[in-house]
Amino acid sequence: AGGVDTVSLENNHVLDMGDSGLEETKETLLAAGIPYASEGEPAILTVKGVKIGSLAYQTFGGRHDELIAKVPGDIQALRDQGCDIVIVSYHWGAEKDYYPNDNQVRLGRATVDAGADLVVGHHSHRINPIEYYNGKYICYSLGNFSFAGNNKPSDMTTFLFQIRMRLRDGEATSEAFKIIPCRISSRTDYNDFAPTPYTDDSSIEVVLRTLR
C-alpha cells in the first residue's frame, strides 16, 4: 500500500495562492498528521524507531553556492536532534531537461559529502538519471507524478524510487533500490491524474534507459 508520510513544500508554485494559501496547506498537512519540510522548517518522522529527517530547498536565483555553504549546517542540526537518516530534496534545474546541469551535480554531490543519505530532485517535469555517489543515491529528477494539467503531456513517463536502508553502527547504508516505471495517467489520450505502472517491456526500457 502506498501513502504520503512527508511532503516537501519547496517549489515555484508554493505561493500560487499567496501566503494564506501556503499557511492553509501547512495547517491541512499537520491536521492530517503529515510533517512537511521547507527551508528553515525540517520535517522529522520516526518509523519503527528510526528517526528520519527531511530538508527541502529550491535553487532559483542561482543559489547553488549559497546552499553548498548552508546545507551542511542544516544536516548537522538534524543529526544533533538524533536523526538516523537525512533526506534532502531540491527543486532545481530547467524545465524539460533530461539531464542535470553542472550546478546540480556540484550541489548534489556536496550534499552527500555533507552527510545526506539520499538526495531527491524535481522541477524539470522530466525524469533524469540517478547517480550513485560515495555510497549514496542522487535522484536528479523524479519527473511528474500527479501533475501537468488535463491535456495530454508531451512526456508521460515517470517512476517510483524505492530504497532499502539499514543502520549499521549508527550509520545508514543503502542496501538496494527498486525502480517502478510508470505513466502519469491511466489513459494515454489525456491526463486523468492516476499514475499507473507500465506493463509493456518497451515503455519500461524507455524509463530505465533514461535513468542510467
Show the residue positions of the predicted features.
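Acidic, metal/ion-coordinating pockets
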Residues: 1-212
